[in-house]
């Protein structure tokens, strides 16, 4: 495709912000609001620290406004609390798991998903991802305890092409996508 403007426009003014695990330790934060984000499949929770700083995290199932979220070591094993993988017992569902310590969370972030802590091996922890794949991570990587909210979003089928069009439009995606073999070579 040649010339002109982009085929799609991303409505980024509607996106509330990035959802990452904050780089704080030993803090207790309060959920001030639950926010719908068109670009995320799970709801976001606006969380406020005692010093007034605010950030977004992906909301776990059962999270509500006014709930306390503990961040750091030796926290209670309640859904929504954030701690290191080495502190979480085996068999516990976790979400928003960091790939490297301090990166903010990379795994098990879509609505209704969770990873499971399989085994703790000293300086590394093995988790089972939602795909079923086993992954070894550093024991200092942090994760949120519990299952993510927003499950059941795929239960309602897309009955019309228009529904798929508006879903893609909200996320800034192009719909429908034409396969390359159906185009002229010059139009790729």
PLM segments and residue spans:
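Conserved strand-loop elements at the edges of beta-sheets that form or border functional pockets
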Residues: 49, 59, 119
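Short acidic-glycine loop/turn motifs at beta-strand connectors
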Residues: 49-52, 131
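S1/OB-fold single-stranded RNA-binding interface
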Residues: 42-46, 54-56, 105
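Beta-strand/loop nucleic-acid-binding surfaces
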Residues: 52-64
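Basic, glycine/proline-rich low-complexity segments that contact nucleic acids
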Residues: 1-42, 63-188
């Amino acid at each position: 495709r040649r010339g002109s403007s982009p085929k799609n426009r991303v409505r980024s003014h509607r996106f509330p912000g990035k959802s990452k695990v904050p780089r704080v330790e030993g803090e207790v934060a309060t959920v001030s609001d639950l926010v719908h984000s068109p670009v995320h499949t799970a709801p976001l929770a606006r969380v406020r620290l005692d010093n007034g700083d605010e950030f977004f995290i992906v909301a776990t199932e059962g999270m509500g406004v006014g709930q306390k979220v503990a961040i750091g070591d030796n926290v209670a094993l309640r859904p929504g609390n954030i701690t290191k993988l080495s502190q979480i017992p085996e068999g516990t569902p976790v979400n928003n798991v960091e790939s490297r310590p301090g990166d903010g969370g990379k795994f098990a972030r879509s609505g209704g998903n969770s990873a499971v802590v399989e085994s703790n091996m000293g300086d590394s922890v093995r988790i089972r991802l939602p795909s079923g794949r086993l992954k070894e991570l550093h024991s200092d990587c942090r994760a949120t305890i519990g299952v993510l909210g927003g499950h059941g979003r795929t239960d309602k089928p897309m009955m019309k092409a228009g529904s798929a069009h508006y879903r893609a439009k909200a996320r800034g995606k192009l719909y429908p996508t034409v396969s390359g073999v159906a185009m002229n070579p010059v139009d790729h």
